[in-house]
Amino acid sequence: MKKNMKLNFMLMSGVLLFGMYSCTPGAQDYSSYVNPFIGTGGHGHTYPGAVVPNGMIQPSPDTRIYQWDACSGYYYADSTMNGFSHTHLNGTGCGDYGDVLLMPTVGKQDYHAMGEESQQMAYASAFSHDNEVAQPGYYSVFLDRYQVKAELTATKRAAIHRYTCLLYTSDAADE
C-alpha cells in the first residue's frame, strides 16, 4: 500500500508539473509597445531615430537646426527633413553636438548660404508622417522631393543607412 501511495504521488506530481509547464505563456516582444514619437513634440526634446541600449550612436532625422524646439534635431510638427545625423541627446533642453548631416539627393543641387531664421537647408525635402516609421532600432521615412525611401538602423557602435531611389529619370542622371 505504501508503494502504491508513492507511485500515485509521483504520477500526480508529474501530471501537475506537466500541466504547469504547458500553461506557461510564451515570451512576449515588449518592444511592440514602444512609441519612439513620444516626446518629439512640445518640449520633450526627444528624437525617433534608431537606437539600441547603451549604443554609442543614435542615427535620427533632423528637421530643425536652430532654436529651442530643435534641441534633439527633430520636431514632430515639422514637415521638412534636412537630413540624418548620428549623435543626438534625448531630452536635453539645449543644443547638442553640431552633427554632420547626411542627405540622399537626386539630380543637381543648388547650395546657398542661409540665415539663422531659416530652419531648412537648401537640399531639404518634404515628408509626411504617414510615410514615417519608427520602432526600437529602426527608422524609415519617404523623402518626397527626391522620391527616396531612407532607412536607418543601429548597432552599439555603428549606424547603417539604406536609401532606395524609387524614381529614376534621365534628367537626374544628366544633371
Task: Please state what every model-predicted region is.
Residues 11-19:
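Bacterial N-terminal signal peptides
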Residues 2-10:
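Bacterial N-terminal signal peptides that target proteins for export
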Residues 171-175:
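A short, hydrophobic C-terminal helix/tail in secreted or cell-surface proteins
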Residues 26-170:
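Accessory carbohydrate-recognition regions in carbohydrate-active enzymes
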